Amino acid sequence: MDERDVAMIDALRRAHEAFNRGDFDAAVEIAHPEVEFVPPGGQAARSGAEALRAWMEPDAFEEQRIEPLDFRVQGNKVLVRQHAQARGAGSGIELDIENWTVWTFDDDLLVTRVESYLPHQESEALEAAGLRE
């Protein structure tokens, strides 16, 4: 693993830590102002760091956490296997899944694209990251 790989992973660790403590401004500090975010489940893509931040902010959840389980680097992309937990604000229904996110970095170590994948989309996440099992 080279220095750039370590720097990308460190940036993602800091972003996850910020997200988990509810500091969404700090969580998007690694994002390019024109970052493209592709939410899970076929939702429409969103553009811009503010749109990414707005998506992170809980609306239907009273609690939410995303813990990275491992990182796989391929060029300028990092595939993160993660454990996501959330609890519905009104319903109390709990979400507890393992899913994937592919983060694409530019030369300045800013994230230009974030692609989120549901539990059953592992092969799509691997393909998006340029990895094959």
Language model features by range: what are they?
Residues 61, 86-96:
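Short, cysteine-centered beta-strand-loop-beta hairpins and adjacent loop/turn segments enriched
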